[in-house]
């Protein structure tokens, strides 16, 4: 013989089995897609969602309520069974309707449309007034039935809060906003004035730097002019030096080949670039000293071969 709550226990068992089937289906789908997962995490997520949908949609309470009715009928308590005689008359039709209703409820719950929103939408409807922006809120038959059954309550805290909102001191609010605006205005003006001072100082520094650059450029131009003058003077001096040496060389009683060699060295002096000219003069002087040294050695050797002695200095 069945126990008093056997049908209710079977309904709870079916709900638990449905949850386990949902967990297995979720993990199997993840495995087929090759996605790594944490079983405990999946189990916890599915349980939270499953419990919310079953409770918010009313499916769990609906199934357990029908199971309780069956248990009462099996235990000769026909009060609930008589109230549900239409359901008992055609169980297959009622089961199909319950299945569709439960499916729709769970779909709405999974989409975020909870029980509160469903009840409010079922209790009220909105009627637009043509030509106006306002509308009329109409109570449905469900709302009227709830009023008759005493299932509607008035939240006094909401009324008190509303009254408190209606007594807001708008003058003090305006004064506070005005003070905040003045404070913000003063801060903006202060920042603007600081920016103007910084910009003015930067402009002065820029003009001062431009003056320094102009002075430096003028000084550089003066140095360039002086340098050009020195370069021209050196070129003239070098030209005069080479001309004087050539004239003096022509007045000497030297061998023509020696004169030609010395003239060639003098003509090789660069009179355009003073730096190169000094290098050329150094080379000419070195060659003259070398020639003089060779001549002295030759003269010394000649004196020694003639058994003569030589000395330097004046007696």
Curated annotation (Swiss-Prot):
The keyword Cell division does not apply. One of its GO terms (biological process) is regulation of translation. Residues 1-149 are annotated as: RNA-binding. Residues 208-315 are annotated as: Interaction with host EIF4G1. Residues 166-237 form a coiled coil. GO terms for cellular component: host cell cytoplasm. It comes from the Viruses. Residues 170-234 are annotated as: Interaction with host ZC3H7B. Homodimer. Interacts (via the coiled-coil region) with host ZC3H7B (via LD motif). Interacts with host EIF4G1. Belongs to the rotavirus NSP3 family. This is Non-structural protein 3. It comes from Rotavirus A (isolate RVA/Monkey/South Africa/SA11-H96/1958/G3P5B[2]) (RV-A).
């Amino acid at each position: 013989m069945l126990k008093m709550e056997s049908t209710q226990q079977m309904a709870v068992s079916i709900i638990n089995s449905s949850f386990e089937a949902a967990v297995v289906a979720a993990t199997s789908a993840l495995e087929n897609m090759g996605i790594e997962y944490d079983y405990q995490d999946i189990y916890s997520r599915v349980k939270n969602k499953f419990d919310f949908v079953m409770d918010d949609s009313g499916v769990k309470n609906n199934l357990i309520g029908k199971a309780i009715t069956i248990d009462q009928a099996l235990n000769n308590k026909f009060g609930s069974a008589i109230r549900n005689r239409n359901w008992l008359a055609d169980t297959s039709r009622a089961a199909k309707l319950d299945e569709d209703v439960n499916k729709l409820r769970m779909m709405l719950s999974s989409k975020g449309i909870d029980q509160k929103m469903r009840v409010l939408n079922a209790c009220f409807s909105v009627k637009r007034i043509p030509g106006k922006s306002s509308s009329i809120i109409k109570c449905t038959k469900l709302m009227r039935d709830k009023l008759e059954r005493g299932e509607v309550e008035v939240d006094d805290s909401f009324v008190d809060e509303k009254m408190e909102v209606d007594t807001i001191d708008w003058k003090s609010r305006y004064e506070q906003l005005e003070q905040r605006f003045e404070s913000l205005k003063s801060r903006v003006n202060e920042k603007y004035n600081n920016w103007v001072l910084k910009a003015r100082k930067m402009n002065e520094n820029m003009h001062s730097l431009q003056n320094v650059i102009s002075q430096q450029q003028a000084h550089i131009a003066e140095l360039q002019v002086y340098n050009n003058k020195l370069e021209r003077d050196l070129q003239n001096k070098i030209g005069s030096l080479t001309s004087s040496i050539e004239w003096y060389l022509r007045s000497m009683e030297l061998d023509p080949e020696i004169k030609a060699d010395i003239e060639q060295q003098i003509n090789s002096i660069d009179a355009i670039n003073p730096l190169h000219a000094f290098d050329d003069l150094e080379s000419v002087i070195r060659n003259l000293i070398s020639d003089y040294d060779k001549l002295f050695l030759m003269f010394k050797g000649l004196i020694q071969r003639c058994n003569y002695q030589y000395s330097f200095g004046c007696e």
